[in-house]
Amino acid sequence: MQPTKVLVIDDSKLIHTMFSAMFPKVPLVHAMDGMDALRRLGEHPEVDLIFLDINMPQMNGLELLDRLKADEVLARVPVVIVSTEGKEQDTVRGLQKGAAAYVKKPFRSEAVRELVGRLPEPALP
């Protein structure tokens, strides 16, 4: 897929910086946790790819994923889980809840871009 607007949800500013460098020509929307992500999605409903951390304050990634998949429009947007080593259970749960793929931290930029290229385009409503 060729994303046109990406939402990055992670409580690490370093991760946001890395994604900005990885996708310099793609507008990124940044959120620090699940609640912040819901606010940002209200402001930017046209995102077509989401990178989602699992362990965050206020609302974790799995809770947010449930909300995204319950929404008729947002359920079509591919979600890529970004998780740390040793959190395989959370990754498996995320895939069971409908995430399209996962990336383990630390990750290589080339591997993430390659993964995004293999994702299918979001289904049209």
Roles of regions detected by a PLM:
Residues 13-30:
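Two-component/phosphorelay signaling modules centered on CheY-like receiver
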Residues 85-86:
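Short, conserved "switch-loop" micro-motifs in signal-transduction and mechanochemical regulators
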Residues 56:
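Receiver (REC) domain active-site loop signature in two-component systems and cognate sites
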Residues 107-116:
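C-terminal output helix
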Residues 30-49:
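Acidic, metal-coordinating helix/loop segments flanking the phosphotransfer/catalytic sites
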